[in-house]
C-alpha cells in the first residue's frame, strides 16, 4: 500500500507485538480513538490470533509514547503522503505520566552540580 499514498492522507504501518504489520490510510483529523475503532472494525484476517474484545483496549505507541485517545495525527505533525510506523498493543489502561523511577529520583532530595574551573 505504501507505494501510493494520497498527498492529503497519512499512511500508518501498524506493528503488533507479534511482529505482524498492516497499513491503513487515515486523515490528519483522525484521533487515536478513531484509529483504534477503524482497525478493530477492519481487523485483518492474518491478525486473527491477536483479535481483541473491544476497540477501547487498543493503544497506539508512537516514538516510545502511548497516544491518548483524543490526540489527532495532525497534532503529531506526521508527514502527509508518507508512511509512519506505530505500534498497536492491547492494554486496559495507560501508564502514569511519571514512571516509578522518576518519582523515586524526585524523592531522594539529592542534587547534582558541576564545578567548572
Curated annotation (Swiss-Prot):
Covalent lipidation (S-geranylgeranyl cysteine), chain numbering: 114
Lipid-substituted positions (S-palmitoyl cysteine): 113
Keyword annotations from UniProtKB, A to Z: Cell membrane, Lipoprotein, Membrane, Methylation, Palmitate, Prenylation
Keyword Cell membrane: yes
Cell inner membrane listed as a keyword: no
Propeptide section residues: 115-117
Pfam family, one: Rad60-SLD_2
Annotated ranges, domain Ubiquitin-like: 10-88
Topology within the bilayer: Lipid-anchor
GO CC list: plasma membrane
Modified residues (Cysteine methyl ester): 114
UniProt-annotated location(s): Cell membrane
Superkingdom of source: Eukaryota
Protein name: Ubiquitin-like protein 3
Gene that encodes it: Ubl3
